[in-house]
Amino acid sequence: MLATNDIIIRPLENNDLEFLFLLENDKSIWSVSGTTKPFSLEQLSNYITHAKVDIAIAGQFRFVIDLNGKAIGCIDLYDYNFKKQNAGVGVVILKQYRRKGFAKHSLALLVKYAWEKLNLKQLHSIILSSNKASLALFYSLGFEMTHKNNYVLNK
């Protein structure tokens, strides 16, 4: 568990099922998440069960962004590569909690975790040029564009 102010980023828990169902089935974020069809409660329950696998084995890890005990978003490490010491990062916040600084605090926590605990040297993210809020978020924490829609932060 990683914390700052009122924000905690923590692993998925079994009681996050309804939150995850709401988040993953929000069609407004499908264009940035790669989702093409709705998830069932059973699929997401299975996902939560298997999401507890170590990042070194699974190659990814999802954290829940928790505000005073309420799940408001997720922040993920994906495409984890131990040898290259890098990983992808993605963040999504429920609509009613956006533009309040929660994504920035969460991303800053995740970057610190990636540098200090996972010993990563690079994080990357794929961001659509139309996603101005995400561009501003990642730029504000030092990510730089390396290719069209690809942003990198080096340690």
Language-model segment annotations:
Residues 28-50:
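Conserved GNAT-fold acetyl-CoA-binding loop/helix
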Residues 22-23:
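Conserved catalytic core of Hanks-type protein kinase domains
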Residues 19, 43-46, 50, 105, ...:
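Alpha-helical elements of Rossmann-like donor-binding domains used by nucleotide-donor carbohydrate transfer enzymes
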Residues 51-64:
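A short helix-loop-beta-strand connector motif used in the catalytic cores of GNAT acetyltransferases and
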Residues 36-37, 60, 154:
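Sparse recognition of residues in long alpha-helices and their boundaries
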Residues 1-17, 26, 64-155:
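Acyl-donor (CoA/ACP) binding surface of acyl/acetyltransferases
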Residues 15-18, 56-58:
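Short acidic-aromatic low-complexity motifs
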